Amino acid sequence: MNSTDLYEIQKLLYLYCERLDQGDFPGMAELFRHARFVTPGDAPAAVCDPAAIVEMYRNYTRIYPHTGTPGTKHVVANPIIDLAADGMSASCRSYIVVFQGIEDFALQPIIAGRNLDRFEKVDGQWRYTERQICTEHYGDLSRHMLREFGPGSAAAPAAPK
């Protein structure tokens, strides 16, 4: 793996976080145009369409009108990237922690877990082919989610019909 490949894959990880935190669901979903997006939960669903990913996030994520954002900071850490021998595909496992801080809600971690990603290089550009979100730790999601989510809830983001 050369340093350019490593940088371009890491950049995709960071763009996901940045776009979510900006409330740019269409921009975030576009990163997965050629990917299978697997949601967390007891019955995970695979979403393979950017419009469906946008709908899913809009159905579950609270956006604050005065900022147009969810008031979050997604932090990706410890990415371990493995490049295939031919240099045309890669996998990555990383940690994700989401912090939220808004006017009446002190800054705190609200959810954490792992992302399991796959990538391919097409025409010299890296792109996602799969993202699997594995949620492992839950904090106070009351200011972040529009629907019940987490241990004991009946809901986890499912693919829209």
Where are these regions (language model features)?
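Short acidic/polar micro-motifs centered on Gly/Asp/Asn
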Residues: 5, 33-35, 110
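Alpha-helical scaffold segments in carbohydrate-active enzymes
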Residues: 12-15, 59, 118
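A beta-strand edge to alpha-helix "cap/lid" segment located at domain peripheries
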Residues: 66-161
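Short, low-complexity N-terminal intrinsically disordered segments enriched in polar/charged residues
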Residues: 1-31
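A structural signal for alpha-helical segments
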Residues: 1-4, 45-48, 107
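A solvent-exposed, acidic/Ser-Thr-rich amphipathic alpha-helical stretch
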Residues: 25-96
